[in-house]
Amino acid sequence: MKIHKGDMVLVISGPDKGAKGKVIQAFPKTEKVLVEGVNRIKKHVANSAPERGAESGGIVTQEAPIHVSNVMVLDSDGNPTRVGYRFDENGKKVRISRRNGKDI
């Protein structure tokens, strides 16, 4: 998967179109990412199950995963770009911006 934890992304489709955020977590098996402040849902949590900030249960607002096809990585200039790969001088695979050719 070309999007990793810590990347800044732009949402390109869906209700949150145009929103920018940082990837909190990536799920390669399902090809989904968790983006900070995007796709917020309200989850009802039981009193006995403390989870993600809910100390005593109730209704918790949290981010839900979004498919990677609905986001684009932002390059160093802050522009949305597709991700490519190249090998550096040590033979290590690095991600590059397709827009300007710089490393991500």
UniProtKB/Swiss-Prot annotation:
InterPro entries reported in the protein's UniProt record: KOW, Rib_uL2_dom2, Ribosomal_uL24, Ribosomal_uL24_CS, Ribosomal_uL24_KOW, Translation_prot_SH3-like_sf
SMART domains xref list: KOW (SM00739)
Domain of life assignment: Bacteria
Statement: the UniProt record of this protein carries the keyword rRNA-binding: yes
PROSITE patterns, per the entry: RIBOSOMAL_L24
Subunit and partners: Part of the 50S ribosomal subunit.
Similarity-based family: Belongs to the universal ribosomal protein uL24 family.
Protein name: Large ribosomal subunit protein uL24
Lineage of the organism: Bacteria, Bacillati, Actinomycetota, Actinomycetes, Mycobacteriales
